[in-house]
């Protein structure tokens, strides 16, 4: 098979949702259909001891939430599928936002009892901004939930996207009978030995079931007043196909997967800093680092840089340019993933995600190119932290482990490090409280370094030019520090302190990052 045909087979997407909507469960079921796991591990592992395949980090297993983005790959129906399972918890939005830069489509999982929730809305905005297609899975039909027409109406009003139901539930909860498949024009049965039946058999199967009568009325209404199906509108991100089902009971998931793969886009190009788009079918390899993960194998204290291949083909042992540093690197130890298990890869193509063993060479956002190509892709989004803590080693004898742990975890980008210019104290900044909990847990569990963390509260962060640096500007209300790139930065106590400083030093330009 030639390079172009290989690239055309790729389907790379992220799963987004509010916490507990069933995102990890549907990921499990997709892997089950892809033949990667023998049984779909349920996320209820907190009690049973069976943990979800995609939640590989110790703290994720304990808490039943995804706090890092897992990458998983399988083949199905002639396609090579790359799933990125993103953190649903809002404190990890930075990791999630970056992950969404590395995919060509998104699957939005919604709890049918709760509808569109806060984190779903936030993540949808990012996806919408990127202009990539969104496929919606209305989950948990095995429980009582809201009326399907209400769910569609809310989806359209809250998210501002048109919807098209690919199937329609017949009852829900204990009265759930199956799905009326509008796209495939058949019935999918929840009970009994037969999985499918023709629409003509509906009246015979369900007799005078009031739920089935309601379904027929709803579908008549949708045919008259609903949106038209349009593959063009789906690919443009203007129309979301909506699938109903139950990930926990594995109902409707296979139909979703098969239909999704028909309409999900091939790998797309990516924009360079000069605005030009790199075509995935360019023969020259290029890619970008969207995530760095330390200790995927705690026994080896390793670090993996996750790379989305944008164009061409990766071959083991190839040399790549790193335009940020002007140096080259050899890609010899490269893996592909099934959550915590991994295998060496000899070649991969545009659309694939590879993991490059990293000894400190790479940073999140780095571009990799070959030959004379030394361009850079557009920068990935970064977030200014809002809450801060001082951090120090509890045991002075563990300073080496403490420094190694901080260095590696900070390079992942979920937490940011600042050093007080005058005292040398370490200060950590994060978007939310959970990031500090995860940091503390991982320092102790992965680096055997207990830490003391002292809250500093919220701070307003502004960078200044090194030319304007004067240590006398620092005070308790505006702490002068340096970030991990040694750039000078002020941590202001509040907006009042910021305005006071700006009035006192009008010639000092204060810069705010995203």
UniProtKB/Swiss-Prot annotation:
GO biological process terms, alphabetically, are: regulation of translational termination
The highest taxon in the source lineage is: Bacteria
Q: Which Pfam families match?
A: EF-G_D2, GTP_EFTU, RF3_C
Q: Main site of residence?
A: cytoplasm
Question: Where does the protein end up?
Answer: Cytoplasm
Tell me the keywords, alphabetical order: Cytoplasm, GTP-binding, Nucleotide-binding, Protein biosynthesis
Q: Which GO terms describe its cellular component?
A: cytosol
**Which sequence ranges are marked TM in the entry?**
none
Q: Which InterPro entries match?
A: EF-G-like_DII, EFG_III/V, G_TR_CS, P-loop_NTPase, PrfC, RF3_C, RF3_dom_3_sf, RF3_GTP-bd
Mind listing the GO molecular function terms for this protein? GTP binding; GTPase activity; translation release factor activity, codon nonspecific; translation release factor activity, codon specific
Domain tr-type G, which positions?
A: 8-268
Q: Does the keyword RNA-binding apply?
A: no
**Which parts of the sequence bind GTP?**
17-24, 85-89, 139-142
Task: Say yes or no: keyword GTP-binding present.
Answer: yes
Similarity field: Belongs to the TRAFAC class translation factor GTPase superfamily. Classic translation factor GTPase family. PrfC subfamily.
Summarizing the function annotation, the protein's role is:
Increases the formation of ribosomal termination complexes and stimulates activities of RF-1 and RF-2. It binds guanine nucleotides and has strong preference for UGA stop codons. It may interact directly with the ribosome. The stimulation of RF-1 and RF-2 is significantly reduced by GTP and GDP, but not by GMP.
Q: Which PANTHER family match?
A: PEPTIDE CHAIN RELEASE FACTOR RF3
What protein is this chain from? Answer: Peptide chain release factor 3
List the lineage, top down: Bacteria, Bacillati, Bacillota, Bacilli, Lactobacillales
